[in-house]
Amino acid sequence: MLSMIEKFGERKAKIFIEQSAKYREDWRHKWGFDTPETSIHSDEEQAERWVADLDKKNIERVNFVMGGGNDNLAKIVKMHPDRFTGFAHHDLFAPNAAEELERAVTKLGLRGFKLLSSGLIRNIDDKDAYPVWEMAEKLEIPVLIHFGVLGGGGGPARNLHNLDPLSLWEVAASYPTLKFVIPHFGACYFRELLQLCWACPNVMIDTSGSNQWMAWMPYKLTLRDLFLKCLETIGADRIVFATDSSYFPRGFSENYLREQIREVRAIGVEDNTVDKIFYKNAARLLKLEG
């Protein structure tokens, strides 16, 4: 994946970061989140902080989708395998991408593959990526792909083709047993994501984050609207709760959990549906059942 500095140069990358800083500050203020700490902690220290945070918030387990490379994340997961799982995250178009995915899963114990679509150098439906999809299907792991806008307002996209979830249509149709999970309800591409889900039953929707992108739509859209439409169309079996938690002192974003449970309860769904969305579907994807 091409970094902002590699694509735009250091000066312009700095401008992009400064432009998005206000949006990020507004977002933290709205949710009552502290500013990310700048102190450096070892992986071992961070792992213990996560366990303490999960205990405090009564959370059984978390899945990390990035963590300083596949080997490093696997090391962290092994510190607390009863509390942590993790996904591979590496260049989709690297010469050994398929082999690295196989190693990450079979040797390192990671349980899925994470991609940032709009950060890719090439189109996500490029045929050169097909060996990776074939490997993921063979390994029976989920693939989590972030489409749509990145970060807070002002976050640049590096490949406009890859912003749209519909760019995955041919890939998802070509590998019907491979589970694709699209986070943040499509991040400004909710309509397109529903169209992809209509055509490809192997595509699931992840609810993660603040979903602040709703404020940037040309029509009113609420979290309740998103859940209602997803339940009406794809059904509870294809909806996966997530938080997009990352830094401390925030830790696990329980504010997102509370808000999403509140909105789902307000719809009046049954307890079994709530269980599917907030635990069972993810457990099934990660092979944690039983």
What spans do the regions from the language model cover?
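Short, electropositive alpha-helical surface patch
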Residues: 74-78, 197-206, 257-265
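Conserved, mostly hydrophobic/aromatic
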Residues: 54, 73, 104, 113, ...
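Mid-to-C-terminal alpha-helical segments outside catalytic/metal-binding sites
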Residues: 2-57, 61, 103, 229, ...
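Short beta->alpha linker loops
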Residues: 68, 92, 185-188, 278
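Catalytic pocket-lining loop regions of alpha/beta-barrel enzymes
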Residues: 111-112, 125-240
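Generic structural signal for well-ordered alpha-helices
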Residues: 48-51, 70-77, 101-102, 129, ...
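Short, surface-exposed connector motifs at secondary-structure boundaries
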Residues: 55-61, 81-85, 173-180
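Active-site gating/metal-coordination segments in enzymes
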Residues: 60-61, 65-163
